[in-house]
């Protein structure tokens, strides 16, 4: 049985694209034949070229950084969130339901909110999302 190959790339957005993890995601996703990187959020660097922040990515064709407020949620299939823990949950609650999210922080790593608050020493504000 042959696998059906999707000719349309998966539209990827990264939130938190100006840190180390964001840079690695940009590098890896831009090389993947099934992915198209179309938005990279870095609020403090919005409007700047990714290649100006990460010179080692100069050879890649990349979008400029945008702010979270500039995100077009109609133009995304999957979001990678590369923000620090406790920052991630503040942003993820603002993303429309139905969009797939891979969060690389600790915010949704543990099943029970009590465990998160005990381990990380901060309140978890996204209780409804934790249940998903």
How should these model regions be labeled?
Residues 1-132:
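N-terminal Rossmann-like NAD(P) cofactor-binding subdomain of oxidoreductases
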